[in-house]
Amino acid sequence: MTNIRKSHPLMKIINNSFIDLPAPSNISSWWNFGSLLGICLALQILTGLFLAMHYTSDTMTAFNSVTHICRDVNYGWVLRYLHANGASMFFICLYLHIGRGLYYGSYMYKETWNIGIILLFTVMATAFMGYVLPWGQMSFWGATVITNLLSAIPYIGTDLVEWIWGGFSVDKATLTRFFAFHFLLPFIISAMVMVHLLFLHETGSNNPTGIPSNMDMIPFHPYYTIKDILGLLIMMTALLALVLFSPDALGDPDNYMPANPLNTPPHIKPEWYFLFAYAILRSIPNKLGGVLALVLSILVLVIIPFLHTSKQRSMTFRPLSQCLFWLLAADLLTLTWIGGQPVEHPYIIIGQLASILYFSIIIILMPLAGLVENHLMKW
């Protein structure tokens, strides 16, 4: 008799994706972040669902409903902080996952990579809309500033912004539609994750050497299920430590003040995981130029497979590219720091230099390093 997991139509799909899936025998812990992202998504949907049961998307009551969740709902504060800090964990895993893809040349699987970029944009949009929902000062002004960027689009900009707002300013209509989309998008993300996995399983996983591993595969279960559980334990330990000991460490104190359209906070800034893009936006004095740079800072990932000049896929044996990669990582940390600083000397010039370096490394220096390394191999 055939094992049910191999014969049942539904179990067969699960079996071929998570149990009997042939995986390279040498993939490192950098390959753990895919499963961690799946767990983060499940956690966000679950905590978000319970929060939505108590939240009201009305400008008069939104702030108070969040306070009510923290004070009066059983373990409401745990739900709220798990959801808020879970988003931070989500983005940490997301950025490390993309970094892994860049380092080991996983972007050569173009379909998987491109779906991943669309996923990144969707997750960023979802997180932005979620940040608006508590209706604190930073929620309101963040929504005003970021949606206002669309007014830089020639001809249709102003109409587009007012259409998104549902009026002439960020108000009740904006909050209601942001809540609706914030609730809907995670389910769309879940569907896109399945497409992401579908494309990945067409080609199989990459590995640290960048060399095809078809002749040396091992079953996903038990080897990588155990490995993923270890990653999960480490991540959950970090998340719970954050939630239970300093839940507001990554938040903005201004968001504990109810939204007031008549009082602008001294420094309007997004959550920490958007600061690098915000720094790039601010580094260009022109509004439209800044918006284009902001979009291109993420969209530049699309052209990376076409800028791959090296004969080797992975950076494991390419010291010059490795130096540039870690310079890029340091540059992104610098941009994140700059994004949280006020717009004054010397932060302005540091931000501008870091922004130029960011695009230069990706578009010019990395392809050049690949060509140089090809020549070095001939020697």
From Swiss-Prot:
Residues bound to a ubiquinone: 201
Principal location: mitochondrion
One Gene Ontology MF term: metal ion binding
PROSITE patterns: CYTB_CTER, CYTB_NTER
Cell location: Mitochondrion inner membrane
Entry keywords, A to Z: Electron transport, Heme, Iron, Membrane, Metal-binding, Mitochondrion, Mitochondrion inner membrane, Respiratory chain, Transmembrane, Transmembrane helix, Transport, Ubiquinone
Binding site for heme b b562: 83, 182
GO CC annotation: mitochondrial inner membrane; respiratory chain complex III
Sequence positions that bind heme b b566: 97, 196
Lineage top rank: taxon: Eukaryota
GO biological process, one term: mitochondrial electron transport, ubiquinol to cytochrome c
Cofactor stoichiometry and binding remark: Binds 2 heme b groups non-covalently.
Residues passing through the membrane, by range: 33-53, 77-98, 113-133, 178-198, 226-246, 288-308, 320-340, 347-367
Membrane topology: Multi-pass membrane protein
Cofactor field: heme b
Subunit note: The cytochrome bc1 complex contains 11 subunits: 3 respiratory subunits (MT-CYB, CYC1 and UQCRFS1), 2 core proteins (UQCRC1 and UQCRC2) and 6 low-molecular weight proteins (UQCRH/QCR6, UQCRB/QCR7, UQCRQ/QCR8, UQCR10/QCR9, UQCR11/QCR10 and a cleavage product of UQCRFS1). This cytochrome bc1 complex then forms a dimer.
Family of the protein in this entry: Belongs to the cytochrome b family.
UniProt function note: Component of the ubiquinol-cytochrome c reductase complex (complex III or cytochrome b-c1 complex) that is part of the mitochondrial respiratory chain. The b-c1 complex mediates electron transfer from ubiquinol to cytochrome c. Contributes to the generation of a proton gradient across the mitochondrial membrane that is then used for ATP synthesis.
Note in the entry: Heme 1 (or BL or b562) is low-potential and absorbs at about 562 nm, and heme 2 (or BH or b566) is high-potential and absorbs at about 566 nm.
Protein name: Cytochrome b
Species whose genome carries this gene: Murina leucogaster
